[in-house]
Amino acid sequence: MKISEEEVRHVAKLSKLSFSESETTTFATTLSKIVDMVELLNEVDTEGVAITTTMADKKNVMRQDIAEEGTDRALLFKNVPEKENHFIKVPAILDDGGDA
């Protein structure tokens, strides 16, 4: 199945993307090749092949919910450049520099 450059431009516009003409041509060619490869899967004979939903045999692995000793706060804050009231202080990211 051939993906046209017009289709690439249409999807790009919907996605609010812009591409040069050479990029549009490259995408159209590449996407056409990808679709052709996927269409080859329709030709594979899967008669008698069991449906596969997952390749992993693992089920949910549960563990006991047991409280454990945490890491020492002093050790956690050892390399923190700035702290305030037991919290790591970071530069303000809001325009006004105020509290969040």
From Swiss-Prot:
UniProt-listed GO biological process terms: glutaminyl-tRNAGln biosynthesis via transamidation; regulation of translational fidelity; translation
Gene3D superfamilies referenced in this protein's UniProt entry, alphabetically: Glu-tRNAGln amidotransferase C subunit, N-terminal domain
Catalyzed chemical reaction(s): L-glutamyl-tRNA(Gln) + L-glutamine + ATP + H2O = L-glutaminyl-tRNA(Gln) + L-glutamate + ADP + phosphate + H(+); L-aspartyl-tRNA(Asn) + L-glutamine + ATP + H2O = L-asparaginyl-tRNA(Asn) + L-glutamate + ADP + phosphate + 2 H(+)
Keywords of this entry: ATP-binding, Ligase, Nucleotide-binding, Protein biosynthesis
GO molecular function, one term: ATP binding
InterPro entries: Asp/Glu-ADT_sf_sub_c, GatC
Pfam families found in the cross-reference section: GatC
Assigned protein family: Belongs to the GatC family.
Protein name: Aspartyl/glutamyl-tRNA(Asn/Gln) amidotransferase subunit C
Phylogenetic lineage: Bacteria, Bacillati, Bacillota, Bacilli, Lactobacillales
